[in-house]
Design a protein with these regions (language model features):
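ABC ATPase NBD coupling module
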Residues: 31-35, 88-103, 121, 129, ...
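Conserved ABC ATPase "signature" region
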Residues: 128, 135-152, 205, 261-262
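Short catalytic/signature loops enriched in Gly
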Residues: 2, 7-14, 28-32, 37, ...
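Conserved ABC ATPase signature
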Residues: 157-161, 165
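P-loop NTP-binding/switch modules centered on Walker-like glycine-rich loops
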Residues: 183, 191, 195-272
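Helix-to-loop junction immediately C-terminal to a conserved catalytic motif
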Residues: 72
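A short, proline-enriched helix->beta-strand linker immediately N-terminal to the Walker B motif
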Residues: 176-180
Length: 325
């Protein structure tokens, strides 16, 4: 029997709520092969308050990008529901009450920008569905480009900008509708360290100015810890630990979280180094029995191989799925 979300994860005052959300993909093997089910997201709940920032961290293939797409309506859940201010979230692109209220920033800004549109037109495009006049769209786009440090460049095209500048354009486009929520899917992973820092500072500044809530997705705990006060750790479709950022960095409880911390640059973490993660992520088509992390866990015992751990509460807003925590 699945544990219910803790009160601090689900509340009536949540801006964006994911309630026991799962997403299953049917995978066929060859032209006449059997169809198999891939559970990309497995019974995940979260509560994102107005103006808050939640970090979602895990290795590539753990399901975090799928969860991000569920959160903004690009995918529909196979089970559970996504609510915005208590109302079911309609599909992205629908001409509805929720249009423009949740936006997404992708990992590759170049592929998310139309090369045939000037960046001013690309930034202004989301306003067209709201009936904003062309002149007003242009004025708002120029103002938003100035906000992200690209004032006076609206007539240029994406290929004329560096990777960091293109990500600034993507930030401007995401903010043009004054969204309540911005889902940031690995927005700095393709950038070098100095440009990463500039982009993260920009995201913090625009949050202070415009107040959107962030669901920030990354494989890098150091990046997530810079921007987010609450962190959720995902492994093979499940959340295995979540905690306030300070508590997590002071003493992560799950061996997987500890291994992610060990992969951080030395200056980014506190305390003693922890054994690095070994082995490959198992296939989500055939997840291990019991605790899904047990094949890679240095602390695994027999019960870990037999039974899936339930949530264990460790403090306010802090819980973990681990028999040894």
């Amino acid at each position: 029997m699945l544990n219910q979300p803790a009160p601090e994860q689900i509340s009536e005052s949540a801006l964006l709520r994911l309630e026991d959300v799962s997403r299953v993909f049917d995978i066929s093997r060859g032209l006449f092969g059997d169809r198999r089910s891939l559970v990309a997201v497995d019974h995940v709940s979260l509560n994102l308050a107005k103006g808050a920032s939640i970090g979602l961290v895990g290795e590539s293939g753990c399901g975090k990008s799928t969860l991000g797409r569920l959160a903004c309506g690009l995918l529909a859940p196979s089970q559970g529901q996504v609510l915005l201010e208590g109302r079911p979230l309609p599909p992205a692109g629908a001409n509805s009450w929720a249009a423009g209220r949740i936006q997404m920033i992708f990992q590759d800004p170049f592929s998310s920008l139309n090369p045939r549109l000037s960046v001013g037109s690309a930034v202004a495009e989301p306003l067209a569905a709201r009936g904003v006049s062309r002149a007003e769209r242009r004025a708002q786009a120029e103002a938003m480009l100035a906000t992200v440090g690209l004032g006076g460049m609206g007539d240029r095209y994406p290929h004329e900008f560096s990777g960091g500048q293109r990500q600034r354009i993507a930030v401007a486009r995401a903010l043009i509708t004054r969204p309540d929520v911005v889902v940031c899917d690995e927005p700095v992973s393709a950038l070098d360290a100095s440009v990463q820092a500039q982009t993260l500072n920009l995201l913090r500044e625009v949050q202070e100015q415009f107040g959107p809530a962030y669901l920030f997705i990354s494989h890098d705990l150091a990046v997530v810890g810079f921007l987010c006060r609450h962190i959720m750790v995902m492994y093979l479709g499940q959340i295995v630990e979540e905690a306030p950022a300070d508590a997590l960095f002071a003493g992560a409880a799950h061996p997987y979280t500890q291994a992610l911390m060990a992969a951080m640059p030395t200056g980014s973490r506190r305390g003693e180094p922890i054994a690095a993660l070994e082995g490959e992520l198992p296939s989500p088509l055939a997840p291990p029995a019991g605790c899904r992390f047990h094949p890679r866990c240095p602390k695994a015992k027999d019960i870990c191989r037999r039974e899936a751990p339930q949530w264990k509460e460790l403090g306010a807003g802090w819980r973990v799925r681990c028999w040894e925590a």
